[in-house]
Amino acid sequence: MLRSVATVLLSAAALPALSESLNHTTGTDGLLLIDKLGGHVRFFDPATLAERSSLELPKNPHDFALSADHRFAYVPIYGPGIYNRNPEPGHELYVLDLAERKVARVIDLAPYRSPHGVQVDARGMLYVTAELDRKILVVDPQAGRIVATIDHDGAGHWLAVLPDGSKAYVANKDDKPFVSVIDLATRKQIGTVPMPRGTQGITASPDGRRVIAMDLAQPEIAVIDTASDAVLERVRLAGTTDPAYKAYYSPDGRWLLTMAGSSISIFDAANLSAPQRTLKVGASPMGIGFSADGKTALVANHGDGTVSAIDIAAATITTTFKAGTGIETLTYY
């Protein structure tokens, strides 16, 4: 079911020069912040870091994907709860016009519930985890409907789609001790990658050769080779005893930043065994966005309603600013 709330139609998305940028977004036009605890999406000026406007959404938005041309953002509505405790699950996907900073349309995902993670492929198809129904929804945002569903053996919370659109890797939290591997051409699960203590966040490298899965119970990441779907190595996060949470590659593939507790670890993405640089940020960091020049990372401190700006090369915090109530994730666009 599609409820149109604007007359604008979604045109075919223009593909970027490098398809690997689709789920590693950046830009210079604006900042999009998903204020989960505040029930809003917020638009900031990327130069001044001041808020331009905001939109109230149903409770609660957690994640986003952008169209290839950065005209639209796609935001699933998870519900007012959290993982495994979400008694009023959401069932909508909001389409936001980034230039106009308004809701363009709402796609109803019912009967599927608790949509959480979302990724986009080079054809413009969206892949959305429907946690309570243990499915991946394939959504055509131009048609405004679900075009297919994919069964897999886990609940599914976050997912990572490879840049070439061949496979998706699904993090199953504590529901199953593995990452589900999905063939997106056949829309079938084709394997699993062992994660004995469960999986928190998950991300693919911009070149598609690696997937990073975050250990749910330990300060450790698993490095998955996407050719073999085997774990190449497990890397301990320095300077923390907290479990790993999420990881983000910079769009140029140079850096990998991870979060655990209130710590950020900065890796040289080409050599994850090299010494890490760590620094403390605000409470419960959850999301990271990268500036277009690759120099700055913005860290959403979900636990205290702030965002920390990091000079990546220097591994220092340059400023911390107030933003909403509890930002889960964010991006430049």
Feature-to-residue mapping (PLM):
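Bacterial N-terminal signal peptides that target proteins for export
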Residues: 1-6
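Predominantly soluble domains enriched in secretory-pathway, periplasmic, or organellar proteins
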Residues: 12, 16-333
